[in-house]
Amino acid sequence: LGGTYIDMMSGEFMINPLEPKAWSENSRFGNQENETDDSPETFRKVTRLSQHISYLKDFFRAYKDFTDAEIDTIEIMLMKLYARFGIDDLTDLDKLENCDYPVMSDLYELVEKEFMAFDNAKKHLYTEGILQNICLGLHSMCKGAESKYFNGRTNIKDGEFICFGVKGLMDTNKRLKDTLLFNILSYMSDQL
Protein backbone atom coordinates (compact mmCIF):
# COMPACT_ATOMS: atom_id res chain seq x y z
CA LEU A 1 0.00 0.00 0.00
CA GLY A 2 3.02 2.27 0.21
CA GLY A 3 2.36 3.20 3.81
CA THR A 4 4.66 3.59 6.79
CA TYR A 5 4.59 1.52 9.97
CA ILE A 6 5.69 3.44 13.04
CA ASP A 7 6.48 1.57 16.26
CA MET A 8 6.10 4.27 18.90
CA MET A 9 7.77 2.11 21.58
CA SER A 10 11.02 1.84 19.62
CA GLY A 11 12.04 5.39 20.43
CA GLU A 12 13.04 5.81 16.78
CA PHE A 13 10.05 8.00 15.95
CA MET A 14 9.12 11.17 17.78
CA ILE A 15 6.14 13.47 18.06
CA ASN A 16 7.20 16.66 19.82
CA PRO A 17 4.46 17.38 22.39
CA LEU A 18 5.48 21.06 22.40
CA GLU A 19 4.90 21.55 18.66
CA PRO A 20 1.46 23.20 18.45
CA LYS A 21 -1.21 21.27 16.61
CA ALA A 22 -4.30 22.64 14.88
CA TRP A 23 -7.34 21.66 16.94
CA SER A 24 -10.03 23.17 14.73
CA GLU A 25 -10.41 24.54 11.24
CA ASN A 26 -10.24 28.10 12.62
CA SER A 27 -7.00 27.48 14.49
CA ARG A 28 -5.50 25.81 11.41
CA PHE A 29 -5.68 29.18 9.66
CA GLY A 30 -4.21 31.33 12.38
CA ASN A 31 -5.91 33.72 14.77
CA GLN A 32 -9.34 33.93 13.20
CA GLU A 33 -12.63 34.54 14.88
CA ASN A 34 -15.54 32.23 14.27
CA GLU A 35 -18.12 34.66 12.93
CA THR A 36 -20.99 32.15 13.08
CA ASP A 37 -20.37 31.42 16.76
CA ASP A 38 -22.71 33.28 19.11
CA SER A 39 -20.49 32.87 22.18
CA PRO A 40 -18.87 35.95 23.77
CA GLU A 41 -16.19 37.62 21.66
CA THR A 42 -13.42 36.68 24.11
CA PHE A 43 -14.15 32.98 23.63
CA ARG A 44 -14.12 33.31 19.84
CA LYS A 45 -10.59 34.71 19.77
CA VAL A 46 -8.81 31.41 20.08
CA THR A 47 -5.30 30.98 18.77
CA ARG A 48 -3.55 27.79 17.81
CA LEU A 49 -0.99 28.39 20.57
CA SER A 50 -3.60 28.99 23.29
CA GLN A 51 -5.49 25.86 22.22
CA HIS A 52 -2.26 23.88 22.28
CA ILE A 53 -1.34 25.08 25.76
CA SER A 54 -4.80 24.00 26.93
CA TYR A 55 -4.08 20.59 25.40
CA LEU A 56 -0.69 20.48 27.13
CA LYS A 57 -2.31 21.06 30.51
CA ASP A 58 -4.34 17.88 29.96
CA PHE A 59 -1.29 16.11 28.52
CA PHE A 60 0.75 16.78 31.67
CA ARG A 61 -2.17 15.77 33.89
CA ALA A 62 -2.31 12.44 32.03
CA TYR A 63 1.37 11.91 32.78
CA LYS A 64 1.42 12.80 36.49
CA ASP A 65 -0.99 13.72 39.26
CA PHE A 66 -0.09 17.41 39.16
CA THR A 67 -2.13 19.75 41.36
CA ASP A 68 -4.04 22.70 39.89
CA ALA A 69 -1.32 25.07 41.15
CA GLU A 70 1.38 22.94 39.49
CA ILE A 71 -0.55 22.84 36.19
CA ASP A 72 -1.05 26.62 36.35
CA THR A 73 2.69 27.03 36.95
CA ILE A 74 3.48 24.72 34.02
CA GLU A 75 1.26 26.98 31.88
CA ILE A 76 3.27 30.04 32.97
CA MET A 77 6.52 28.20 32.21
CA LEU A 78 5.21 27.17 28.77
CA MET A 79 4.38 30.79 27.94
CA LYS A 80 7.90 31.84 28.99
CA LEU A 81 9.41 28.99 26.99
CA TYR A 82 7.50 29.78 23.80
CA ALA A 83 8.41 33.48 24.22
CA ARG A 84 12.10 32.50 24.39
CA PHE A 85 11.65 30.78 21.06
CA GLY A 86 9.94 33.86 19.60
CA ILE A 87 6.53 32.17 19.57
CA ASP A 88 3.38 33.94 20.77
CA ASP A 89 -0.31 34.17 19.85
CA LEU A 90 0.51 36.31 16.81
CA THR A 91 3.14 33.97 15.36
CA ASP A 92 2.24 32.35 12.05
CA LEU A 93 2.97 28.77 13.06
CA ASP A 94 2.57 27.53 9.49
CA LYS A 95 5.83 29.29 8.61
CA LEU A 96 7.82 27.48 11.33
CA GLU A 97 9.76 24.25 10.88
CA ASN A 98 10.04 21.38 13.38
CA CYS A 99 13.40 22.75 14.53
CA ASP A 100 11.84 26.10 15.50
CA TYR A 101 9.91 24.65 18.45
CA PRO A 102 11.17 23.89 21.95
CA VAL A 103 11.50 20.29 23.09
CA MET A 104 10.76 18.79 26.49
CA SER A 105 14.33 19.17 27.79
CA ASP A 106 14.03 22.92 27.08
CA LEU A 107 10.96 23.04 29.32
CA TYR A 108 12.71 21.08 32.04
CA GLU A 109 15.79 23.31 31.91
CA LEU A 110 13.62 26.43 32.21
CA VAL A 111 11.71 25.09 35.22
CA GLU A 112 14.93 23.85 36.84
CA LYS A 113 16.60 27.24 36.28
CA GLU A 114 13.58 29.00 37.85
CA PHE A 115 13.79 26.59 40.80
CA MET A 116 17.54 27.05 41.33
CA ALA A 117 17.29 30.85 41.12
CA PHE A 118 14.14 31.10 43.25
CA ASP A 119 14.31 34.02 45.68
CA ASN A 120 11.90 33.81 48.63
CA ALA A 121 12.37 37.54 49.23
CA LYS A 122 10.54 38.33 45.96
CA LYS A 123 6.85 37.86 45.25
CA HIS A 124 5.98 35.03 42.89
CA LEU A 125 2.79 33.49 41.59
CA TYR A 126 4.22 30.07 42.43
CA THR A 127 6.33 28.65 45.23
CA GLU A 128 9.74 27.05 45.28
CA GLY A 129 8.06 23.80 46.30
CA ILE A 130 5.78 23.88 43.26
CA LEU A 131 8.79 24.31 40.96
CA GLN A 132 10.55 21.42 42.71
CA ASN A 133 7.49 19.16 42.30
CA ILE A 134 7.27 20.03 38.60
CA CYS A 135 10.97 19.21 38.11
CA LEU A 136 10.53 15.89 39.89
CA GLY A 137 7.34 15.11 37.97
CA LEU A 138 8.75 15.93 34.54
CA HIS A 139 12.29 14.57 34.91
CA SER A 140 11.68 11.13 33.42
CA MET A 141 9.69 12.55 30.50
CA CYS A 142 12.20 15.29 29.71
CA LYS A 143 15.61 13.87 30.60
CA GLY A 144 15.20 10.40 32.09
CA ALA A 145 14.09 6.92 31.08
CA GLU A 146 10.91 8.02 29.28
CA SER A 147 12.48 10.93 27.41
CA LYS A 148 13.03 8.70 24.36
CA TYR A 149 9.27 8.91 23.77
CA PHE A 150 8.79 12.66 24.33
CA ASN A 151 12.04 14.66 24.14
CA GLY A 152 12.85 15.47 20.55
CA ARG A 153 11.62 16.99 17.34
CA THR A 154 8.81 15.46 15.33
CA ASN A 155 10.49 13.20 12.79
CA ILE A 156 7.52 11.48 11.16
CA LYS A 157 7.51 12.20 7.46
CA ASP A 158 4.18 13.00 5.88
CA GLY A 159 2.79 10.04 4.03
CA GLU A 160 -0.38 8.87 2.40
CA PHE A 161 -0.81 6.06 4.91
CA ILE A 162 0.72 5.84 8.38
CA CYS A 163 0.10 2.94 10.75
CA PHE A 164 1.01 3.58 14.38
CA GLY A 165 2.19 0.43 16.16
CA VAL A 166 0.95 0.68 19.73
CA LYS A 167 0.90 -2.98 20.78
CA GLY A 168 3.94 -2.51 23.01
CA LEU A 169 2.06 0.21 24.91
CA MET A 170 -0.08 -2.45 26.56
CA ASP A 171 2.98 -3.69 28.46
CA THR A 172 3.82 -0.31 30.00
CA ASN A 173 2.42 1.62 32.94
CA LYS A 174 -0.98 3.29 32.59
CA ARG A 175 0.26 6.89 32.77
CA LEU A 176 2.95 6.40 30.12
CA LYS A 177 0.47 4.54 27.90
CA ASP A 178 -2.20 7.24 28.29
CA THR A 179 0.28 10.05 27.63
CA LEU A 180 1.75 8.38 24.54
CA LEU A 181 -1.73 7.70 23.14
CA PHE A 182 -2.71 11.29 23.89
CA ASN A 183 0.35 12.49 21.95
CA ILE A 184 -0.35 10.16 19.00
CA LEU A 185 -3.99 11.24 18.82
CA SER A 186 -2.99 14.91 18.86
CA TYR A 187 -0.66 14.26 15.92
CA MET A 188 -3.39 12.38 14.04
CA SER A 189 -5.89 15.18 14.69
CA ASP A 190 -3.45 17.70 13.26
CA GLN A 191 -3.00 15.63 10.09
CA LEU A 192 -6.71 15.49 9.22
Identify the residue ranges that each predicted region occupies.
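P-loop NTPase motor domains
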Residues: 1-10, 18-192
